[in-house]
Amino acid sequence: MKHLYGLFHYNPMMLGLESLPDPTDTWEIIETIGKGTYGKVYKVTNKRDGSLAAVKILDPVSDMDEEIEAEYNILQFLPNHPNVVKFYGMFYKADHCVGGQLWLVLELCNGGSVTELVKGLLRCGQRLDEAMISYILYGALLGLQHLHNNRIIHRDVKGNNILLTTEGGVKLVDFGVSAQLTSTRLRRNTSVGTPFWMAPEVIACEQQYDSSYDARCDVWSLGITAIELGDGDPPLFDMHPVKTLFKIPRNPPPTLLHPEKWCEEFNHFISQCLIKDFERRPSVTHLLDHPFIKGVHGKVLFLQKQLAKVLQDQKHQNPVAKTRHERMHTRRPYHVEDAEKYCLEDDLVNLEVLDEDTIIHQLQKRYADLLIYTYVGDILIALNPFQNLSIYSPQFSRLYHGVKRASNPPHIFASADAAYQCMVTLSKDQCIVISGESGSGKTESAHLIVQHLTFLGKANNQTLREKILQVNSLVEAFGNSCTAINDNSSRFGKYLEMMFTPTGVVMGARISEYLLEKSRVIKQAAREKNFHIFYYIYAGLHHQKKLSDFRLPEEKPPRYIADETGRVMHDITSKESYRRQFEAIQHCFRIIGFTDKEVHSVYRILAGILNIGNIEFAAISSQHQTDKSEVPNAEALQNAASVLCISPEELQEALTSHCVVTRGETIIRANTVDRAADVRDAMSKALYGRLFSWIVNRINTLLQPDENICSAGGGMNVGILDIFGFENFQRNSFEQLCINIANEQIQYYFNQHVFALEQMEYQNEGIDAVPVEYEDNRPLLDMFLQKPLGLLALLDEESRFPQATDQTLVDKFEDNLRCKYFWRPKGVELCFGIQHYAGKVLYDASGVLEKNRDTLPADVVVVLRTSENKLLQQLFSIPLTKTGNLAQTRARITVASSSLPPHFSAGKAKVDTLEVIRHPEETTNMKRQTVASYFRYSLMDLLSKMVVGQPHFVRCIKPNDDREALQFSRERVLAQLRSTGILETVSIRRQGYSHRILFEEFVKRYYYLAFTAHQTPLASKESCVAILEKSRLDHWVLGKTKVFLKYYHVEQLNLLLREVIGRVVVLQAYTKGWLGARRYKRVREKREKGAIAIQSAWRGYDARRKFKKISNRRNESAAHNQAGDTSNQSSGPHSPVAAGTRGSAEVQDCSEPGDHKVLRGSVHRRSHSQAESNNGRTQTSSNSPAVTEKNGHSQAQSSPKGCDIFAGHANKHSVSGTDLLSSRICHPAPDQQGLSLWGAPQKPGSENGLAQKHRTPRRRCQQPKMLSSPEDTMYYNQLNGTLEYQGSKRKPRKLGQIKVLDGEDEYYKSLSPVDCIPEENNSAHPSFFSSSSKGDSFAQH
């Protein structure tokens, strides 16, 4: 484990506790001084000299060893300084019963801490004067300067860590969390310290891993300590420490409670210490020159004595209880304490009094404490804080992972975790519905839910996780814009489905988009802007000097993004935020998987839309026709055509004219200026709408899981709905009408799940429950959606009439919509009002018919299909679905799950690029479709996705209309609570049963909790009761066929079930491991036996093969020798014998693979003519001896284990009476290449030639017997028997022809059971073992 504090590396054994001295030999405890962070502090006396000291006694707890060691190392390393406590040493007191103790002996500071001094004075109605405060701060600054000069950051400067001596000295203590740097410029990034004194940059390190800080964090802490010296407590002292971590970075720098009561220098000193930007904050050295501190110069001794007198006076007062503020260390896990200890109720259901005032009071108090989340049973209320909070870090993600909901404060992560756990436990799809007004924080809540689900999903593929996290940012850049009430308002509906494996691993995602507000492309209301992406791309291309490449102007803004202020271009070129957002969008494209060519095409289409907006039209007056139009600014036309890669002439023709087909004839008619402008705007809207739809489809293609994974495992989904919120502007048009109808549908969905279905089941199951009244908006939805007299049906009907106007539309509404929800205001012709669930809204009917028709001339489509831009061709070649979006396409790409395990990703099928997934019921004729019909089908499609899953609701509330942080408008919040039915929801969640489960499903799901695994309990009431009682639940009810449970019951049951399954999984893991090990052992043994059998068979085969080769060679050699013997016998004594060739020895060595050698030798007499006829094959010794009494034939035999040589030599009885040794010459056996030992090629058939030359009657050839092993002695016996038998039948041979075994042969000696033949005049060794060169060569061979 690496040490937290830089220079020293943590090792539990580094301290060497056993080597430390025993303190009892030197120190003796006198009394208790106080309690430290990790142990008590005592006053001790030195037994040797009687000096006093303070000792901090600590138990060597493992998780504190690092801080103990850090303090020890720093104290030992740090030189002495008057303003830093002295260190006398560390001791270890061993105790085997209760464990040893560490003693840190320090300088005794009898005066206590400055905090105790200040509190004591305040209790007596006094306070420290400014001179004394400046003296204490001066001493603290000197101590900090000493630390910083030695490259040490204290990181826990506070009043309790500034001690005083009885003489008035100021000492810094407690270095447990100090950091020692390796360089004065090196910064730290560990969030550690006591929360009230922690600097903002230190807190930021917990949330932002690229943040860091330097030694000036001690300056901030000293500033807080200065306030503590003045007021007695640090700022926010009455708040829970966890909440201070949220407040400090966001609040302005704190000040004294009553700054006017203190001098200007003191206030200025505090303000300098508490500069939030630490880069601008002064260092300790600079603060020593501050006027407030410089006032101490020359008065140090006087102020020291005065402080000592004050301390002396305080000793006579009653002691003040010491307030401890515990340190927090983010590297050490901790849990946030229960909110009930320091705040109001987390769950409104637990309130004793349920009324509007109580609920509003609860929400307001929690919002003031930045507790923006509150439960209503299993429903989460989220108040928009209008500021960034530090409660969404990975540390908080770990807190909200598989724990009970009540274990932690309410959080958006808890709702995400509840949906995830239900999905994994119940194997059922989930749906998280986020609703609320525009600007209430729905989009950000959706971001956080996706973030937490990716954390819980633990994607094996890190790239997939990054892709999913980038999806929202990319889609929102194209689908969000700035409105009058929200700077990041969603102008489309989004349903994001995150797909998981059955084990809960995220494997992909899919987005469904609904009803994009395309009209915003061409026109925006006052104080509103176009879609974000237009500003991002303009700023990015301007920064890259590429505006000219896309034919965009650098001075005057395009008409589609210009506003009434005229500052758009200045904002685009000067604001860094736009440029950074452009870089972020490029990063999103790259991470998700878009190619550079695709991104470039997207940019060209966006630039083309902006250039199209600059095209203007003018009327052409002629003698016969005055409604003709032309394009006066040809440059804008040329720019648009160039960027879109189409012909400018064709584009102009498509804009200024249109074709009409009548009775088979095509008539070209000119467009008026107004109609040409409408065609231009319709073209821009179509381009942007289809481009947005293509981006969504492309994202879905890049993030889709492998089909084999889905089909094999049957994955599950968690859907997140982020839809545009309820809107009510000063002028509301057709867009707001569609948005508010969609919100009515979501509210109806909420009412059905929370109220209607629950109370209906109470009646059906015979449950006695008090009915809860709620506002049912079903009649209002019928007014909108029913046919043929619903509002949308009437709108479509009027849109089909060419002569219809907006006035006739309003009149038709008034004639047919006769209900309390519709009214017509007097005095306003083109307006109508609707009473929505969220309040009354007045709509302007101007342009509603044209917006609903949303016609796109076919001439424009034809021109755009001729573009050289492949993407643009694709946008207008793919048909639209019933929801108005492009049909999904497939391309040759790598799916998101390609990096999942191989058994999931096998068998991918490749399809052709741009292959359209055509469904007859999806594709439709765009000429007959209207925006209202698209919208109706979008709602149907959205609900079909939502009803599949189990819902989880997040109700976002906007606390004020000014978007101000910490501002709570009771009237606005109460109106939203009433409209969304939160008050009724509190009541039904308190009284009702939100979970109704069939007996069969309940028993099947939870029977593990009460029955053993091999039992199969019946799906009866008794089984359900047994499970519920075993789980120790109460307040549940059984109906006729269902179990009725509270919202918290299911959570408890799921936690218990996970615990049981966890234990089962552990047992299964051990069992599977044991079975696997045993199975592997058997397989290994079987394989070893098989290997042995294969090896044995091979060895046998190889031995037989080699033996066969050796046998054949020996047979051939024996036949050759036999032929030679026959020839010699036929010549007899009549052949002249030369003295030099009387006895010749032929030795032949046959080499075989595997180092098997056979030595064959023969001694025979040959005539001079025979030696010549052999062509040198048989060589004779240069010193050939005379005929010996006995010439021996040397034979060798080979066994499978190696080569054994059995050779004989002749007795040394020559004819002349001299001892001669016949020479032996080795010849290799002929190999496949026919090479001799010396490499000379042998003539084929040379041996056969010898046999043919001496054609004599062959005597019966005796086959030589092979020795099977060295231990076999029967060969010699059989050989002797054979010789005796042959000798008895034949005439005695001559001495040179008789085959005998030499008694002196070494091999024969080891085999023969009889005594060796005695040597006769054996003064020389056999030539086979002689030291001659030839003999050595043979032996080596």
Curated annotation (Swiss-Prot):
Residues 1118-1133, 1170-1186 have a biased composition (Polar residues). GO terms for biological process: cochlea morphogenesis; positive regulation of filopodium assembly; regulation of actin filament length; sensory perception of sound; visual perception. Expressed in retina, kidney and testis. Residues 1252-1262 have a biased composition (Basic residues). SUPFAM superfamilies: P-loop containing nucleoside triphosphate hydrolases, Protein kinase-like (PK-like). It catalyses: L-seryl-[protein] + ATP = O-phospho-L-seryl-[protein] + ADP + H(+); L-threonyl-[protein] + ATP = O-phospho-L-threonyl-[protein] + ADP + H(+). Its EC number is 2.7.11.1. It holds the Pfam family Pkinase. GO terms for cellular component: cytoplasm; filopodium tip; myosin complex; photoreceptor inner segment; stereocilium tip. Keywords: Actin-binding, ATP-binding, Cell projection, Cytoplasm, Cytoskeleton, Hearing, Kinase, Motor protein, Myosin, Nucleotide-binding, Repeat, Sensory transduction, Serine/threonine-protein kinase, Transferase, Vision. Coiled coil: none annotated. The active site is at 156 (proton acceptor). The keyword Transferase applies. It is found in: Cytoplasm, Cytoskeleton; Cell projection, Stereocilium. It comes from the Eukaryota. Residues 343-1058 form the Myosin motor domain. Residues 27-293 form the Protein kinase domain. Residues 939-961 are annotated as: Actin-binding. InterPro entries: IQ_motif_EF-hand-BS, Kinase-like_dom_sf, Kinesin_motor_dom_sf, Myosin-III_kinase_activity, Myosin_head_motor_dom-like, MYSc_Myo3, P-loop_NTPase, Prot_kinase_dom. In the C-terminal section; belongs to the TRAFAC class myosin-kinesin ATPase superfamily. Myosin family. Interacts (via C-terminus) with ESPN. Interacts (via C-terminus) with ESPNL. Probable actin-based motor with a protein kinase activity. Required for normal cochlear hair bundle development and hearing. Plays an important role in the early steps of cochlear hair bundle morphogenesis. Influences the number and lengths of stereocilia to be produced and limits the growth of microvilli within the forming auditory hair bundles thereby contributing to the architecture of the hair bundle, including its staircase pattern. Involved in the elongation of actin in stereocilia tips by transporting the actin regulatory factor ESPN to the plus ends of actin filaments. This is Myosin-IIIb. It comes from Homo sapiens.
